[in-house]
């Protein structure tokens, strides 16, 4: 009886020892396999180019479009795009869902629904006074009008550059421009600007400071006027202050998140002739105009090429900002 019990206990102990040995052996084998596998992965990883799924995948759901194997953030997925267009476009299209249609078309170019905003403006005058360029990227469409050519080119100069501006009290003070980057910017429904250059004795040069009729007229009934006079010379100004506001401004540099698209016209606006435009490049393009649908289709087709020459900026531009810091 006791011999049977001892044999049973001995068999059980041997089984436990054998099982323990087998488990330890399996553990050592698995450790060897895992560590060897990880070692091989570490050695070969610099030479392998594996697709990181979830990065730069087409948001359209299509896997046909080739995407660069990169972990860089796709800017369109986190950026906003604003399109500014004249009200006549909305009137001509006359479709309550045209913006939704364009949003779906922008989606095919990588811009998620809700990232593209459409903003209309009545005319250049109202837009220049209150641009409201709030998006990461801003495309301003201006239909060519020969009668507004000066206003269009000056509006382009205004919104394509950053300006530091201060109020001017022309009733009490004389003003001079210090360098080529220093301009006087006037905005309003009708801006007529006259200037009288002064000598060192504050006497008018070719004009009488007491008679504005003898002043030189540099802008007549314009909605937006950027005035440039001889640097380092004091001037007395006459401005139609009841319909116009004038500011003393300094051009700081390009506003790289704004582009101007001229719609139609045989002449192309060009602001690069200004020596203060540095570098001598501009974010402007012209598209042919027949119908506004055609214009928007063209912009959707080329939106990514346009944005590639721009830079995402966080600083916004509105009427209040313009008067003090643009």
UniProtKB/Swiss-Prot annotation:
Database matches in Pfam families: VP7 (PF00434)
Region annotation (GPR motif) ranges: 253-255
Disulfide-bonded cysteines: 82-135, 165-249, 191-244, 196-207
Location relative to the cell: Virion; Host endoplasmic reticulum lumen
GO cellular component terms, semicolon-separated: host cell endoplasmic reticulum lumen; T=13 icosahedral viral capsid; viral outer capsid
Positions annotated with a glycan in the UniProt record: 69
Keywords attached to this entry: Calcium, Capsid protein, Disulfide bond, Glycoprotein, Host endoplasmic reticulum, Host-virus interaction, Metal-binding, Outer capsid protein, Signal, T=13 icosahedral capsid protein, Virion
Region feature CNP motif, mapped onto this chain: 165-167
Record Gene3D superfamilies: Glycoprotein VP7, domain 1, Rotavirus outer-layer protein VP7, domain 2
Binding site for Ca(2+) 2: 177, 228-229, 231, 301
UniProt PTM comment: N-glycosylated. The N-terminus is blocked possibly by pyroglutamic acid.
Signal peptide: 1-50
Residues noted as binding Ca(2+) 1 in the record, renumbered to the chain: 95, 206, 214, 216
Single GO molecular function: metal ion binding
Protein's job: Calcium-binding protein that interacts with rotavirus cell receptors once the initial attachment by VP4 has been achieved. Rotavirus attachment and entry into the host cell probably involves multiple sequential contacts between the outer capsid proteins VP4 and VP7, and the cell receptors. Following entry into the host cell, low intracellular or intravesicular Ca(2+) concentration probably causes the calcium-stabilized VP7 trimers to dissociate from the virion. This step is probably necessary for the membrane-disrupting entry step and the release of VP4, which is locked onto the virion by VP7.
Annotated family: Belongs to the rotavirus VP7 family.
Family annotation (HAMAP family): Rota_VP7, Rota_VP7_A
Subunit structure: Homotrimer; disulfide-linked. 2 Ca(2+) ions bound at each subunit interface in the trimer hold the trimer together. Interacts with the intermediate capsid protein VP6. Interacts with the outer capsid protein VP5*.
Note: Some rotavirus strains are neuraminidase-sensitive and require sialic acid to attach to the cell surface. Some rotavirus strains are integrin-dependent. Some rotavirus strains depend on ganglioside for their entry into the host cell. Hsp70 also seems to be involved in the entry of some strains.
Protein name as annotated: Outer capsid glycoprotein VP7
Organism: Rotavirus A (isolate RVA/Pig/Australia/AT/1976/G3P9[7]) (RV-A)
Lineage: Viruses, Riboviria, Orthornavirae, Duplornaviricota, Resentoviricetes
């Amino acid at each position: 009886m006791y011999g049977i019990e001892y044999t049973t206990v001995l068999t059980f102990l041997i089984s436990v020892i054998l099982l323990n040995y087998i488990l330890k052996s399996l553990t050592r084998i698995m450790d060897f396999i895992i560590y060897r596998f990880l070692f091989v992965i570490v050695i070969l990883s610099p030479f392998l180019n594996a697709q990181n799924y979830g990065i730069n995948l087409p948001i359209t759901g299509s896997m046909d479009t080739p995407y660069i194997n990169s972990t860089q953030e796709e800017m369109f997925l986190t950026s906003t795009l604003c399109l500014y267009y004249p009200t006549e476009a909305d009137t001509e299209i006359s479709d309550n869902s045209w913006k939704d249609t364009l949003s779906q078309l922008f989606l095919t170019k990588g811009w998620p629904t809700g990232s593209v905003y459409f903003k209309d403006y009545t005319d250049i005058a109202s837009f220049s006074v209150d641009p409201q360029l709030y998006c990461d990227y801003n495309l301003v469409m201006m239909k060519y009008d020969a009668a507004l050519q000066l206003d269009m080119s000056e509006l382009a100069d205004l919104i394509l550059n950053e300006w530091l501006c201060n109020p001017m009290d022309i009733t009490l003070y004389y003003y001079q421009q210090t360098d080529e980057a220093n301009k006087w910017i006037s905005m309003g429904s009708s801006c007529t600007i006259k200037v009288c250059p002064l000598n060192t004795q504050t006497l008018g040069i070719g004009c009488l400071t007491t008679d504005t009729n003898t002043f030189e007229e540099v802008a007549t009934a314009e909605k937006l006027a950027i005035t440039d006079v001889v640097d380092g010379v004091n001037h007395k100004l006459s401005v139609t202050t009841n319909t116009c506001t004038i500011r003393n401004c300094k051009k700081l540099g390009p506003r790289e998140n704004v582009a101007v698209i001229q719609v139609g016209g045989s002449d192309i606006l060009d602001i690069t002739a200004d020596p203060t435009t540095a570098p001598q490049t501009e974010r402007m393009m012209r598209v042919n105009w027949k119908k506004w649908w055609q214009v928007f289709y063209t912009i959707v087709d080329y939106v990514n090429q346009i944005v590639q020459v721009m830079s995402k900026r966080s600083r916004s531009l509105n009427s209040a900002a313009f008067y003090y810091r643009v």
